[in-house]
Amino acid sequence: MKLKLLTAVFATTALLSGCGGNEVGDVGLGWFTLKDIKITSLQDEVVTGVTCHIASIEANLSLSDPSDSSISCRQTGSITPEMIAKIDKSSSGEVVFKQSKSIFFKTMKVRRIYDQKNQTLLYLSYTTKETEGSFKHSLSTVPLWGTDAYVAPSKTEALTQ
C-alpha cells in the first residue's frame, strides 16, 4: 500500500514538473538536496516583443511547497500599438502564464497589468494554493518608452503635471 502511494506521488510530481515554458537553465543546489533552481523563458503571446525569465525552486522528488520565485522581463523585440490595443487594461490585468508547482494544488501564475499613466507593462509572478495559502510574489516592469507603442504626452499635459 505504501509503495503504491509513494509511486503515485512520484509519478504525479514528475508529470507536474514537466508543465510550462521553455527551460533555459538548471542549477543544482548541492549534493545533499533534491532541489534545483530552474530558469524558464516565457514570451508574451500578445506582446511578443517581451520575454520574461522566471527562476524558481524545483524539488521533483520532494513533498515540499516551492513558493519562492523571481521574474525578470525585458523588451526583446518590437512592441506595437496594435499589441497594446489587444491587452486587458483592467487594474487586475490578465494571466499570461500558469504552471502547477506542487501536488498540493499550488500554481504559479504570471499576470500582465498595464500602467496606462506611465505607459509601462507590469508582469507580476505569484504562487497561490487554490484552497488556502501563503502568497509570494515578484514584479518586473517593461516601459514602452522607445517603442512604437509609446505615446508622447502633449505639451499641455506635461505643463499640468
Please place each PLM-identified region on the residue numbering.
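Residue-level signal for mature regions of secreted extracellular proteins and peptides
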Residues: T12, E45-V46, P66
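Bacterial N-terminal signal peptides that target proteins for export
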Residues: M1-L6
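C-terminal motif of bacterial Sec signal peptides marking the signal peptidase cleavage site
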Residues: L16-G18
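Bacterial N-terminal signal peptides
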Residues: T7-A14
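Post-signal peptide N-terminal segment of mature Sec-exported envelope proteins
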Residues: D26-T48
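Mature extracytoplasmic domains of secretory-pathway proteins
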Residues: T51-N118
